[in-house]
Structure formats: C-alpha cells, structure tokens
A protein has these predicted regions:
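Beta-strand-loop-alpha-helix segment that lines the small-molecule cofactor/substrate pocket
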Residues: 262-263, 462, 473-518
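Rossmann-fold NAD(P)-binding glycine/threonine-rich loop
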Residues: 270-288, 292, 298, 492-513
Length: 739
C-alpha cells in the first residue's frame, strides 16, 4: 500500500510503498477513502522538522535535557547514535480519515465488514491506503448522506466539539471565536447548532466572510473592532466564553480573549497559542482559563485507546469516541455544512503538493485539504525491496526480524550490522512504516506485516524476536517448530505456563538453538570481571544497583498481560548476570518493595538471591532516582578480591595488593555486538547456544519467583530446571514457597 511520510531531518514529504498493517485484536482494518490534512498540527510538525538542529534545540529544551542526560549516562557516541536513529526514522503523517471496514479483529462485535467509519489517532488514522485502528478510535458513519470527504473531518470536528464542551457554552450564550481557520469554522457552526450567539475574529477578510456565510452572527478583522463588537453584542458586559482556535506563537490571542470576556467568563485554548496569561486582567475578572485536550476524555489513555476499556457513560458522558459520534450525527442531521470548507483534494500520489500548500511553499489560499485514495489498492503485507542476493563468503546466518521498535532499530540492528556472517532477509513489524524503515536502513531484502512470512520463508534460518513481551512465547515456539534458530530479546516469556511450552518446543526442535538477549554477560569488561573473581574459587557476595528510572503507570511495560511488569520484563537481565558471575543458579529468592505512594508501580524493589553454590546476590532495582545519574553499578566481593563495574564503562579490580582500572573505549559497551559474534559463531559451527538453555530456563524461573515473592511478602524457593522439565500438570511447578 502507499503511505505518506516525512523526513525528520529536512521535512521532505515522500509517498512510499509499504506493507499493509497487521490486523490486531481489538482493532478494525479499514480501506481508506479520504483523509484530512490538518493545517494546524501537521503544518507545525512540518515546520519543526524543517528547522536546523540548533533551532529544534531552542524550541524543545526538554529534548536537549534528555540528550545531555544520555551523554552523562551512556557516553557521547551512544547519545549521538540515538539522536541519529531518531532523525533517520521517518514520521507517519495524518490522524483523521474515513473509509470502509475490510476486516475486524478479535473481540470486535459492534463493527461489521462493510461498515463506513471515521477513524482518529496519530499512528492509526494516517495518510495511507489502509489503516489498522483501535475500536475506540473508530466511529460509524450514521448515514449514507454523509460522504467520506465529510467523515474525514471527524477527528478535527471532535477537537472543536470538545472545546465547545470545555467552554460550557449554553443556549443563548454570547461566545467569541478567535481564529477562523478550519478549526474555528467548525467551532462557529457547532456553537450555532447549540443556540449560541457567535462572534468571530480573524485577520483574513476571506475567512471572516466565510464564517458569516456559515452562521456567525458578526465578525471582525481587527482586535479593536472585535473588542467593540463583543461589548455591543453583550450589552456591555463582555462575552460569556471565548474559544481560541488560532495557531500563533504570539500572546495576542490570549490578551484579546481576556479583553473581550465578561467577569468570571471561561477562556478555552483549543489551538496552539502562547499562554503568558496577563495576570491583572484574568485576576480582576476572575477568568477561568482552560486548555482543551484534543478530542476528549480517553485521549492519551492507553487503557482506553489501545485496550478498548471504555469509560461508563454515567461518569464520563462525552468521551473522545462519543464526541466523534456526536459530530457525525450533526453531519447526518445537516446541522453542519462542510462543503465550503473543502478547498483542495489531492490523490495520495500527489500528497507532497498538499504539504507544499499548507506550509506556504505554494502561495495559494486554502482551508480544508483532503487526500483521496484508489479503491483497488493492494492489501499485500509483504514488500520486496531488492532481488540481488549479495552472497558473501561469510554468509550463513540469514535473519528474519520480528519487531522494529526503538530498541531494535537503535541498538540491536546496528550491533548486528557490525558482525560478519549475517545476511538480512526479511524485516517484520506490525505497521508497514516500521517494517519498511528497518528494511531500508539495515539492508533487508523485503519487509512484511505478516509474521507467518518470516516463519515460512525458506531463506530465513534465524528468527530475531524484538516484539513486545506478550508476543515472545508464541513467536519463539512458531520459529522452533519451523526449524529455525531463535534469538529472542528478554524476557523469554511472561509466565511458567509459557515457559513449559517453550521447553517442550525446544526439546522437539533438535536442530535449532535458542538464545535470549542477555547481552551484559558478553560485555568485554564483564568478561574481564568474571575472570578476575572466578579465580577466588569460593562463594561470592554481589550487589547490583540499577537506577532504572521512572516510567508512567500506564506504560505498556507495567501491564501484566502485555509487558509482564518490570521484574519479569527487566530484572531478568540482572538475574542472568548474577548467574553468569557465580556460575551457579538461584536456590531461594526474596523481593521487598518500598511503600508505593501512588505514582510508582511496585518497581522500587530490593531482590535477594541465594545461589546453590552459597553465593549471595542483591539487586536494587529502583525507579525513584535521578535519571541523569549512572544507571548500573555492580560490586563483587570474594576470596580477598573486590571488583566494581560502573555502567559498563569503568572496571576496578582490587586484590593481592594491586589495583587496576579498565575503561571501555569511546563508548559504553553492554555486549550487544559480543552476543551476536558468539551467536554467529555457534550457528556456523553447529554448536549449542552461547547461553546454555538450562541457564536460560533457570534465570526465568528465578525471575518468576522474585515476582511471586513480591506478591507474597516472603522468600520463595526456586526448583532446579530438571524438576521443572518433568511432566507435572502444574503451571507453576518451578516455584516452591520457602517455609
């Protein structure tokens, strides 16, 4: 399918051929008929992308702080690599579209194939021939009388409608609308449908005249004239509410809003404007200033938008979905007239012309700009980018990738590209945009949104799994059953039931190896550290401090069904590293948590592990620290020796009266390249996994036990991997509570 992208470096607009998106549970698959180009949001995005790095830094000091923190924590080269990766990845544009439902995902019961729908959401309702959209970002078009062109306005219409609701506009109110662009014109019509007296202001006489034509009671093109108009139409009191629908870096719209408002009026910022509130005016009038958030309650709530958990209507009357439905109902009842707002239509092949228009490269008046789509577009989920095999003497490990998110494209794939003997065959991701980006940047021959294309591809002998955690187990099993080697990013799975299935699949796949991305054990300084302490030949005491950093409670990693929580999803890394250093496996574990004040997610924990060789380890995994401080520090004591590894950049070795310091050259090295060099060597030699499969199972069993201990508040014994492999019917056979 064709999709519109923007280059983050220079704002160039391109139309690319990408695989159609994968249909996900709780989503609908839509053939797009029309989409709306937002003259506000998308123009601002294009203008920002077109600025120099220095200009971007001045506009987004928050991003500069993030980069500086990364430099102090990970080093200059790692930070530069992360910035380049972010800039290299093109942005998918668009957030308001309409079309016909082609397929519905699991769990969808109220949307049917063939339904005409409006779609919303950045990353979902994009400018593309097909879209996969979560259910609560979809609204049925209620009547055939509403065209696809009109329905494509629904997202922006919901933004305007939510602004009106925030203004508490009532029948008979006098309401001012500042800014009569597309958002302002929709706001004017919605207010008139609600029975308000509407006064509009825009410096463009053409837009002011259009607002009059669409129902505004009076308009003005100057600030002084608008102040007089508002006093005249409100019996000298000032207006009851003001909606700022302008896009401006100036504070003039907010100043004007304060000037025309009556005492205790409501001022709502719907557009993007400067908000340096004039205190004296707003204080003396006791004005209520509100910022209207997008298209209503539910926006930016992953539980609502991604999981489809609706808010009860008795508690939240107007969610974003219900705002979309209300706007469509106004269209069906002919309370709104959108035809005068549509000034341009472009086929998707000419999308660049649409952006030239809204960014001013084409000097021509515009308002509503639509993108149209052919109705015979291909739904192919697999795109071939090249046909030459480029076989080298070192070609052996032929990669099929599943998952092309931030970690894969910024860390994993760059490390793989530096290892000889790897050939990139097919890149798979849930969206065509991510799949194509990974394929083009890292030299894959083709890209797909259908994971079956990876498992069935005869050229792929090694599957790399870098998807979200809840998908790992099923994909690992599918690859093993296809006879393919597997590299799975951590965690291997989310629970013991999944682990038992993987153990069985691995037992049956006699010719395939399985490796998990426990990369830290392959870091050069980690190997030097182990060699040093291993000579002690006695149990070790290890303290591993992880300054993990805060992530919001609604982040997918905290979701037990999708991310598994931070203990399962991340602490497994550090459990493996302790197993690596001791050469043993945990026998008993205990997890204690700090009291949760409400904004953390049980991710401030201290884990204690007693190993079968007598070693003791503690992992302090903390989300309550300063993100600018170093992330990881490991201290090992044993046999009269001490080893300290600081953030995989500096290693201190103390023993026998000697003190030695080693540093990682140029940048932090956490072993990502090393793990792939070891894996390629193993595959080429027909050897077992660089991390023994029993060790992987033991690490996951210990991790599950740590999570269990956190819930129980008591120590938990971890059975040996051999016992777990027995044919016990229990799904939790690997864990024993300690008495």
């Amino acid at each position: 399918m064709k999709q519109v992208f923007q280059d983050a470096r220079n704002a160039e607009i391109t139309v690319e051929e990408v695989p159609a998106p994968k249909l996900l549970a709780g989503c609908v698959f839509v053939r797009t008929a029309a989409s709306l180009v937002s003259a506000g949001t998308e123009r601002a995005s294009s203008e920002f992308a077109g600025k120099s790095l220095l200009q971007k830094a001045r506009m987004r000091p928050d991003l500069v702080r993030d980069v500086l923190n990364k430099i102090s924590r990970d080093g200059l080269m790692a930070a530069a690599s992360a910035v380049r990766s972010r800039l290299d990845q093109p942005s998918a544009l668009g957030y308001s579209s309409a079309g016909i439902v082609i397929t519905v995902g699991e769990g969808i019961t109220d949307i049917n194939v063939g339904d005409r729908v409006a779609c919303a959401g950045a990353g979902h309702a994009v400018h593309a021939e097909f879209a996969c959209v979560p259910r609560l970002l979809v609204a049925k078009v209620p009547s055939e009388s509403v065209s696809f062109d009109e329905a494509a306005f629904t997202t922006l219409g919901a933004v305007a409608l939510h602004g009106v609701r925030n203004a508490d506009a009532k029948l008979g109110d006098v309401v001012a609308v500042i800014g009569l662009g597309l958002l302002g014109q929709l706001t004017v019509q919605i207010l008139k449908a609600a029975g308000c007296c509407v006064l509009g202001m825009d410096i463009s006489s053409e837009r002011a005249d259009l607002a009059l034509h669409l129902g505004a009671d009076a308009v003005s093109t100057s600030a002084s004239g608008f102040r007089d108009l508002c006093l005249q139409r409100s019996a000298g009191h000032g207006v009851d509410s003001v909606l700022i629908a302008a896009q401006s870096a100036s504070n003039d719209p907010v100043n004007l809003a304060g000037a025309v408002a009556r005492n205790r009026a409501v001022v709502v910022a719907v557009g993007t404007v400067a908000m340096d509130i004039p205190r004296r005016t707003f204080y003396e009038k006791e004005l209520d200033f509100r910022v209207s958030r997008s298209y209503g309650p539910g926006r930016y709530d992953a539980a609502y938008e991604q999981k489809g958990i609706d808010y009860p209507i008795g508690y939240v009357r107007w969610t974003e979905t219900r705002n979309m439905e209300a706007f469509l109902k106004l269209l069906a009842d002919r309370k709104l007239d959108l035809q005068p707002l549509i000034t341009h239509r472009f086929p998707i092949t000419r999308a660049r012309s649409a952006y030239d228009l809204i960014t001013g490269k084409t000097p021509e008046p515009f308002l509503g700009v639509l993108v149209s789509y052919p109705q015979n577009a291909s739904e192919d989920r697999h795109i071939r980018l090249s046909t030459d095999r480029r076989i080298t003497a070192h070609q052996s490990v032929r990669i099929g990738l599943l998952g092309a998110g931030g970690f894969a494209t910024r860390t994993l794939l760059p490390a793989m590209k530096r290892v000889r003997g790897i050939e990139m065959i097919v890149a798979g991701a849930a969206t065509g945009a991510h799949a194509r980006y990974a394929a083009q940047k890292f030299g894959f021959r083709s890209c797909t949104t259908d994971e079956k294309e990876v498992f069935s591809n005869p050229e792929v002998n090694t599957v790399v799994i870098a998807t979200r955690h809840h998908l790992h187990a099923g994909q690992v099993i599918s690859a093993l059953r296809s006879g393919q080697h597997v590299f799975c990013e951590k965690p291997l799975c989310l629970n013991e039931a999944e682990l038992k299935e993987i153990v069985a699949a691995h037992r049956d796949a006699t010719s395939a190896l399985l490796m998990v991305g426990f990369n830290r054990r392959f870091a050069p300084l980690a190997i030097r550290m182990k060699d040093f302490v291993h000579a002690a030949r006695e149990p070790l005491a290890i303290h591993y401090r992880v300054n993990a950093g805060f992530i919001p409670a609604d982040h997918w990693l905290h979701d037990p069904l999708q991310g598994g929580g931070r203990i399962v999803g991340e602490v497994c890394h550090f459990v493996d590293f302790l197993c690596f250093l001791t050469g043993s496996s945990p026998a008993e574990v205990e997890t204690r948590s700090l009291p949760n004040p409400g904004w953390y997610s049980n991710d401030n924990v201290v884990c204690t592990l007693r190993f079968r060789d007598g070693s003791l380890g503690t992992i302090s995994y903390l989300a309550n620290g300063d993100g600018g401080f170093s992330k990881e520090r490991i201290e090992v004591f044993g046999g009269g020796k001490i080893a300290v590894l600081d953030d995989f950049r500096r290693l201190e070795l103390h023993g026998g009266g000697k003190n030695n310091i080693f540093r990682s050259r140029f940048t932090q090295d956490k072993g990502h390249r090393g793990e792939w060099e070891a894996l390629v060597t193993a595959i080429q030699a027909g050897a077992e996994s660089p991390i023994n499969f029993d060790e992987i199972v033991n690490t996951m069993l210990a991790t599950f036990a740590l999570d269990e201990s956190r819930c129980l508040g008591q120590p938990v014994r971890v059975r040996e991997r051999e016992l777990f492999n027995s044919d016990t019917p229990s799904a939790t056979a690997g864990i024993d509570r300690a008495s």
